[in-house]
Amino acid sequence: DMEARRILEALRSGIPSRAVGQYFSEARPQIMKEVSVRLDRVSETGKSDGFVISGKYGEGKTHLLNTVFNMAHGANMVVSYLSLSKETPMDKLYLVYQKLVSNTYLPGRQQPGFLQALDGMTPNSPLAGEMLAYAAKELDTDKLYYLLRSYMSTEDQEERFLLQADLEGDFVANGLLKKIYK
């Protein structure tokens, strides 16, 4: 079984793996209970909050994060996983956003990305209506509302490419976005 071999190899090498996190998470029952309660709360209320995990090198922080990723994804939640580094420093939020978006997994998907879900949507579909209403009412800015509406409405491939780039974090000037929105 290839999955079993990958898990054994990850354990042998000490490299954190989502597959390992899926099967070996029972060693921390209190933390797992807290994570489970928090995920249930997010599922029920639609609101999330923060949770700080700290520890020394080799104490299993990444293993725990992989386990949480699997739990949330298994609970039909949108999840994203990224590592902060020199290439993705916390003080450069546009880089964090790009990495976050490129590592976003939709429920039931094994590969990251969300544009494939948008491509089949029209502005009049029920899901699009929910997304647009949320973007218009719940966010601090209306930019995402206009981006989504334009992306779903345009037939022009160049406009679609620019809107896609903006959604993925390669931001387009607001003047150009206004021109596309018409």
What does each model-found stretch correspond to?
Residues 1-49:
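A short, basic N-terminal segment
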Residues 25-29, 58, 170:
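Conserved phosphate/pyrophosphate-binding and hydrolysis machinery centered on Walker-type P-loop NTPases
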Residues 36, 55, 72-74:
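Conserved ATP-binding subdomain of kinase catalytic cores across diverse folds
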Residues 45-67:
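Walker A/P-loop nucleotide-binding motif
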Residues 59, 63-182:
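P-loop NTPase nucleotide-binding core
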